[in-house]
Amino acid sequence: MIETLKALCKLSGPSGFESDVREYLRAQAEPCADHVVEDATGNLIVFKKGRVHVKNPPLLCAHMDEVGLLARRADDNGFLKFSFSG
């Protein structure tokens, strides 16, 4: 699990540009999932059937994107000024 977390942290995924994260998650999920779907907005939906029927099956939701930073300029003292994306 630690190696998976490290791999995810190394991926770039600012809002609107999450494809690297999505493809990594798809590759990790497909071997153990019953069905994997990407919807029109890029959400990755993974289905895994349980061994028994339960009234309220568990659901795991998470963001794939991260806040991105754009360096806009450097001031006279060499400090960078950033804008956020996402």
Task: Explain the meaning of each model-derived region.
Residues 1-86:
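N-terminal hydrophobic/helix-forming segments and targeting peptides
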